[in-house]
A protein has these predicted regions:
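Acidic, surface-exposed loops and disordered segments
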Residues: 1-375
Length: 375
């Protein structure tokens, strides 16, 4: 169970001679490698012909850490970006429709495979980084990122209608204090601690979701004890001290924002975030998040003021160089694929129409349409 893909083997498995639905199903192997809070993997998909529909999975929501479902939608946006990059790698363009407002069925977007199109070197570099991207929750060193990288990350954000703002040196201490305050506020909640514990896994887990203890540098024994301790002990002060020190010592501290704050913006910021993470991975950097500073509404508002941001901060990233970390588990494509149809709705409609004018068999029973009789 790994986010690692044996890319050459997978590429040989691409259904070159298959139909659009088979190709989309294959591309979902890359979509599911996207990051998500607590590795909840809160997405599901329907494939119908040349169209894939992306759904938010409410059963994997985090009501304590993410009461509005903002980070859940962002995770789905990151998965969608992976799928689009994979389609480009295999020579297909994609068109996308974002569904407005709040839908009871959780449908967020539709993407469709379009005509064949050659990929670009920039998109190819991002695609190749998909199986190598990790969330590095361990300490990062204080080396500066490569020259020109931050400007490149800013451009990636703009491609998706978001913007990326580096935290300036003179703003660093105030931002670190906000991170610490967010830590203390979140960890003080028994509900929040129980939620974290529920998604924390022992190192030897057979589960395909959640965060194994090794992601935090825990021993096997500690990985079993940690979720039990969280339910009874508030680690807020320790977490606040650690995270504020990491924020001050991180050379690249970045805030991703959008002009407004709705589901469309959350989805776009998830796509932008994934492009940023992949570009950083391609440059040899590690990344992780300070979710507490955007996860608490009042702290998020104060962050906007502290950095002079006119938009809505969606996520804070820290980038740097660190030790290579093990991947977290991932669910199988069959676990997140809720429906699979070879033909599109349009193709089925065309197939059914001739049946309406066919003669009734002599036995008196109507002959079934081939389209409807298919298994």
């Amino acid at each position: 169970m790994s986010t690692e893909i044996a890319v050459p083997a997978v590429e040989r498995a691409f259904p070159t001679w298959g139909g659009p639905a088979e190709r989309l199903r294959f591309l979902l192997h890359y979509a599911v490698l996207a990051p998500s809070r607590h590795n909840t993997q809160p997405w599901s998909f329907e494939v119908e012909g040349d169209e894939v529909r992306v759904y938010a999975d409410p059963s994997r929501a985090l009501p304590a850490a993410d009461p509005d479902g903002r980070e859940l939608v962002m995770a789905c946006g990151a998965a969608l970006q992976n799928l689009r990059l994979a389609a480009s790698h295999y020579g297909f363009a994609t068109s996308m429709e974002v569904l407005p407002g709040h839908r009871r069925d959780g449908l967020l977007a539709r993407a469709r495979l379009e005509e064949r199109r050659a990929t670009t070197p920039e998109a190819e570099e991002l695609f190749q980084a998909i199986p190598r991207r990790r969330t590095n929750r361990l300490p990062l060193d204080g080396r500066e990122p490569p020259e020109g990288l931050i400007a490149s990350l800013v451009r990636e954000a703009r491609r998706e209608g978001a913007w990326l703002r580096p935290v300036e040196e003179h703003q660093r201490r105030a931002v670190a204090e906000l991170i610490a305050e967010g830590d203390r506020m979140q960890w003080a909640s028994p509900r929040f601690r129980s939620e974290v514990a529920a998604w924390t896994r022992p190192n030897a887990t057979s589960r395909r979701d959640g965060i194994p203890g090794y992601s935090h540098g825990m021993s096997d024994a500690a990985s079993y004890l940690h979720p039990l301790l969280l339910r009874f002990h508030d680690p807020g002060r320790v977490e606040a001290d650690r995270d504020s020190r990491r924020a001050i010592g991180t050379k690249a501290l970045l805030v991703l924002s959008t002009p407004r704050d709705g589901k469309g913006e959350w989805l776009a910021s998830g796509e932008a975030m994934q492009r940023i993470l992949l570009r950083a991975t391609a440059a040899g950097l590690s990344a992780s998040y300070f979710g507490q500073v955007t996860g608490v509404r009042e702290v998020r508002d104060r962050l906007r003021q502290a950095i002079g941001e006119s938009g809505e901060p969606q996520v804070m990233l820290r980038l740097g160089y660190g030790l290579e970390v093990r991947p977290t588990p991932r669910r199988l494509v069959d676990e997140v694929l809720r429906r699979f149809e070879e033909r599109s709705p349009r193709a089925r409609t065309l197939a059914v129409r001739p049946a309406a004018v066919r003669a009734t068999p002599r036995c008196g029973a109507p002959e079934p349409s081939p389209a409807l009789a298919a298994p």
